[in-house]
């Protein structure tokens, strides 16, 4: 049985916590796309961790954590992350790496930085993790799969061939130092030694695991609005952020995915440039940013202050639809307890007309939020375990959002810890 955990919005929704929680019941957790460009923050008995490449299940003894073929694998970051958890008394997790996963090369990170410099004010707000150059090479068929590290002759020929192109760009477009082929080969041989114990045919492993009745959790990165096809293009990432891609990025059949848990925040936040209709500014944004998340709303990868906004029903309804949502996990509800009133974006006004459908980018940039103001609950809700024990206005907020987005909210997160979760029945669950 396969479940996916994915984001409805811009990322930063709290997927790491939800995956960490659901991993208690899973046998295998798979990262199926993206790279070290986005982080998952997890708070558990070992402490607080920001993971970028490792799946969120690495804290459990009973699970196998998998880097799927769809991942952009930065090998040094991967091993630095393993060390960062084992240095804090987390037992060495069981990890497998797909032999078909592709490697983030050292020059991908350089090219990412150089291109952002070249674009200046027209840049895409990259985390400079090498992701766009990595995927450009993957689809230009000049990327390096993990399995290619183990064929010395092939590796050498390919390095020299690829660097012919890269060095022309470095010299004539970016005016930067050239890459030495032998130095790069030396680095790749080091990568080979590091990764060798973990490499296997992940697709075959998962096929057998599913035949054996194992539970598999697919862990997505970022959210619907960062998807290159369905997101706010071009302010998107370079790999699909949708649950549908989980089948491709893990190497399993699409029909195996039975449940899709889409994570929504009780307010909105985003890192990087692009249209953000419900965005707030000034003191109002600073206050929400300071109180938000776990220790403030700052990017887990870059440390950049996140842009803040009210909950966006239009974007979230769209995000849930594209994901194929069976359940919504509604996170960081506890953060809003300081507010007398809570605005919610229920529509977009574009050219004098109001819509509840999420538009394409050039229309989105003209959109103004249509807000409905709900009463706050003005109290602390951490520690509450039963939905009916939440303050009435808090329940009304959850139920209003559920009605607007049209997908069942079956989990409500009211704190950063693994067990700060409230399960609820939803009448929409039976309708889906």
Where does each model-flagged region fall?
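Non-transmembrane, aqueous-exposed alpha-helical and coiled segments at domain scale
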Residues: 1-432
């Amino acid at each position: 049985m396969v479940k996916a955990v994915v984001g409805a919005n811009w990322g930063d929704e709290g997927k790491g916590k939800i995956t960490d929680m659901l991993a208690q019941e899973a046998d295998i957790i798979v990262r199926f796309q993206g790279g070290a460009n986005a982080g998952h923050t997890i708070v558990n008995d070992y402490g607080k961790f920001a993971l970028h490449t490792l799946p969120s299940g690495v804290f459990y003894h009973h699970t196998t954590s998998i880097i799927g073929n769809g991942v952009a694998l930065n090998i040094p970051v991967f091993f630095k992350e393993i060390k960062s958890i084992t240095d804090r008394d987390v037992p060495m997790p069981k990890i497998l790496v797909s032999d078909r996963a592709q490697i983030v090369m050292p020059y991908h990170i350089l090219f990412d930085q150089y291109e952002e410099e070249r674009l200046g004010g027209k840049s895409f707000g990259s985390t400079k993790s090498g992701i766009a150059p990595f995927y450009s090479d993957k689809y230009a068929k000049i990327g390096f799969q993990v399995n290619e590290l183990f064929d010395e002759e092939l590796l050498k020929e390919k390095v020299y061939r690829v660097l012919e192109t890269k060095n022309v760009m470095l010299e004539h477009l970016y005016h930067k130092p050239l890459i030495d082929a032998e130095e790069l080969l030396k680095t790749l041989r080091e990568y080979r030694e590091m990764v060798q114990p973990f490499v296997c045919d992940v697709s075959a492993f998962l096929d057998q695991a599913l035949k054996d009745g194992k539970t598999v959790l697919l862990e997505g990165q970022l959210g619907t609005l960062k998807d290159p096809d369905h997101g706010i293009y071009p302010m998107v990432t370079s790999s699909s952020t949708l649950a549908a891609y989980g089948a491709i990025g893990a190497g399993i059949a699409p029909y195996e995915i039975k449940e899709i848990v889409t994570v929504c925040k009780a307010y909105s936040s985003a890192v990087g440039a692009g249209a953000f209709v419900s965005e707030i500014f000034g003191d109002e944004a600073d206050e929400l940013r300071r109180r938000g998340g776990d220790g403030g709303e700052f990017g887990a990868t870059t440390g950049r202050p996140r842009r803040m906004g009210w909950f966006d029903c239009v974007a979230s309804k769209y995000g849930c639809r594209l994901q194929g949502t069976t359940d919504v996990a509604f996170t960081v509800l506890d953060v809003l307890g300081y507010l007398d009133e809570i605005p919610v974006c229920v529509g977009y006004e574009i050219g004098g007309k109001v819509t509840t459908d999420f538009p394409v980018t050039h229309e989105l940039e003209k959109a103004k939020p249509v807000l409905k103001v709900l009463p706050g609950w003005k109290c602390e809700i951490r520690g509450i375990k039963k939905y009916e024990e939440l303050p009435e206005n808090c329940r009304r907020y959850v139920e209003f959002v559920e009605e607007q987005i049209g997908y069942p909210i079956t989990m409500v997160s009211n704190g950063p810890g693994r067990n700060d979760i409230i399960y609820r029945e939803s009448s929409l669950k039976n309708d889906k």
